[in-house]
Amino acid sequence: MSEDVVKPASGRRQVARAVALSGVWLALRPRIGAAQAAADTLLNVRQFGAKGDAKSEDTRAIQSAVDAAATRGGAVFLPPGVYRSGELQMRPHVSLTGIPAWDYEHGFGSVIRLADARARCLLNITGAFGATIDGLSLDGAKLGAGVHGVWLNKPDYGKQEDTFRIERCQIANFSGDGVRLTRAWCFSIRHSMIAYNAGDGISLRGWDGFFLDNWFSGNHGAGFAAREENASCTFTGNRIEWNREGILIVGGDGYNITGNFFDRAGTCGLAILGGQQISITGNFIKRSGKNAKPGEYDSSQIRLERTRGVTCSANNLQAGRDDNGSGVWSPSYGIVYKELQHCVIGNNVLHDGALQQLMVDLGGHGEGAVVKDNPGCLSPQPKGSA
């Protein structure tokens, strides 16, 4: 694939090719005007000296391109290559766009690889209102300690919505969280893979987020965790798999968790502690509790404690072991619940749903706690299995 530099004086064919690669189309303008507009607002990082050869230090070149795009309401295009970089500061209303070609385990296409173990993060989106990160593989290279992939860190919520977008990206191998959001509101993360990070896949303090069609895979913390104030998030069509914890929500409200696949969490597949006004519907939750001690409540598919106004229905729960037929069978329990008020746990199916007990009632409920019609059976284990 050509890595030609896109310059304002380039011919229309070259500019049009760069435009097509970045997924940006200019329509309803004269052809010459469209080409010139693309050259002015679609900036190729090679134009600013980036090499993308997996050897050179490209931090200054990429940052210069982002800063230039911010002055003209433009976008920055990274042709396929491996760009070694330290911390980059995104700017408001700038799109950082590449070609997504990553696979399940590795980054390909347009890759930005962390080159500074002392960095706080790779992409800092603090204050970058309306920014877009699209089609990139962000590789932490397992450098440093507590280095995040994408980081938003505000002292307060401010008066303006963040409205950033992360699309078609792989964010992997960071020594901190894949995405760390502190006081974020109004944003979306879609069609991405957030995997193999030493912390959480996504750590959220904030609200008004959309998480659609993502993989949260193999993170050493939770696939998704919200441990401080959090609210009003939608999870649809995600796969949350092989993380130390699946989804952990502490004290949140206003969640819609629908149509997701939870697989092989180290502890609970889905834990909601102190939450309210949450809908949990139509999810498949499979073989949770891989690393939990058998008989402890962390060895469960779903755990609901101190919840109000929660609906948990039409979910399918199944026990199991590792893909290759080895490893421990888990979990011990299907749904563990306590201190419910105005909640419904009903019409879930637990065929082969757990090893010891399908439904565990720890009591302490207030009024309006309805738990009924959750059919199923314990999972048989082959004799001599681990």
What kind of region is each of these model predictions?
Residues 1-10:
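N-terminal secretory signal peptides
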Residues 9, 29-48:
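C-terminal segment of N-terminal export signals and the immediately downstream linker at the start
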Residues 45-77:
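Acidic Gly/Asp/Thr-rich repetitive segments characteristic of extracellular carbohydrate-active
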Residues 62-71, 83-97, 104-134, 139-162, ...:
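Extracellular beta-strand-rich solenoid/capping regions of secreted or surface-exposed proteins
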Residues 85-87, 106-108, 116-121, 141-148, ...:
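Short glycine/acidic-rich loop motifs that flank beta-strands on beta-rich extracellular proteins
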Residues 91-92, 118, 128, 133, ...:
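Parallel beta-helix/beta-solenoid
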